[in-house]
């Protein structure tokens, strides 16, 4: 049985899970074989994440690949050999940015389409959504990677750059999962003072924030997979931290190198600041 898939749901939030699905769809399309994976609720939020078929292991005759093997240069050739022998490929489930950098054969928005929409409260309050969204990611990021919680100066520099492009009066929305983010208070105060901040109660922050980032003209982005995937399946361009990209490239991170070089399919880099 020729197929490719994962056995268990990956750890982490929605962005991590969506990256796994995108990578599965990329490889399924490349090899022309069905994909399979755990049946989770994300399929109600994203078109293309359908209920995967389930086959008995005896029929699959699987060959297992761990994360290190998936990232090796020889992986695609080895996987092709397995599939040509009518066996299946089963991968460890953390197929995140490093895998997408290797398997971005098609733009993600060709493979999946999100069903997220701006909540009713925001539509009633503001009528239209902000062209600029700031994504502030905090919480566990402080312990995940030094420098991953971006400084307030990054967001201010990005807003200054957008002002030079004629967006000095454009409305701004702040999306964050962390009310204690060190940049939140200062940014909110200044944007509120100038009448640019879109704020108010939200019916469903998770879905509404994702929709806002996917629909925005520009997202001033954290390194979060939640923000990155919104840009990949949406229509926004992104401003990223030059300091963050430098640090990741120094560690050999192909994903961020491709973002800098504007060679990651489906990603639109507006600028680094």
Question: Model-flagged regions — what are they?
Answer:
Residues 167-258:
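Donor-binding and catalytic core of enzymes assembling or modifying cell-surface/extracellular glycoconjugates
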Residues 4, 40-169, 265-273:
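Secretory-pathway luminal glycosyltransferase catalytic domains
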Residues 5-6, 34-40, 133-135, 173-175, ...:
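A structural signal for short, well-ordered beta-strand segments and their strand-loop junctions
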Residues 1-11:
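Nucleotide-activated donor-dependent transferases that construct or modify glycoconjugates
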Residues 9-19, 143:
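A short, glycine/small-residue-rich beta-strand->loop->alpha-helix junction that serves as a flexible
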């Amino acid at each position: 049985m020729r197929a490719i898939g994962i056995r268990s749901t990956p750890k982490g939030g929605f962005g991590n899970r969506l990256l796994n699905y995108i990578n599965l769809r990329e490889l399924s399309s490349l090899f022309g074989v069905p994909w399979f994976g755990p049946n989770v609720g994300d399929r109600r939020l994203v078109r293309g994440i359908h209920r995967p078929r389930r086959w008995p292991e005896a029929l699959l005759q699987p060959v297992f690949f761990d994360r290190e093997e998936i990232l090796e240069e020889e992986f695609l050739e080895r996987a092709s050999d397995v599939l040509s022998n009518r066996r299946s490929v089963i991968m460890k489930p953390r197929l995140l940015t490093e895998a997408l950098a290797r398997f971005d054969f098609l733009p993600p928005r060709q493979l999946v389409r999100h069903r997220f929409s701006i909540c009713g409260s925001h539509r009633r309050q503001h009528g239209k959504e902000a062209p600029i969204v700031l994504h502030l990611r905090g919480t566990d990021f402080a312990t995940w990677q030094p420098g991953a919680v971006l400084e307030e100066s990054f967001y201010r520099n990005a807003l200054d750059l957008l002002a030079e492009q004629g967006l000095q009066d454009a409305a701004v929305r702040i999306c964050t999962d962390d009310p204690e983010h060190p940049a939140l208070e200062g940014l909110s105060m200044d944007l509120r003072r100038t009448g640019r901040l879109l704020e108010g109660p939200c019916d469903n922050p998770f879905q509404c924030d994702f929709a806002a980032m996917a629909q925005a003209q520009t997202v001033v982005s954290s390194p979060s997979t939640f923000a990155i995937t919104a840009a990949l399946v949406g229509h926004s361009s992104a401003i990223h931290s030059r300091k963050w990209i430098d640090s990741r490239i120094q560690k050999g991170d192909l994903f961020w190198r491709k973002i800098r070089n504007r060679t990651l399919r489906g990603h639109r880099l507006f600028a680094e600041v």
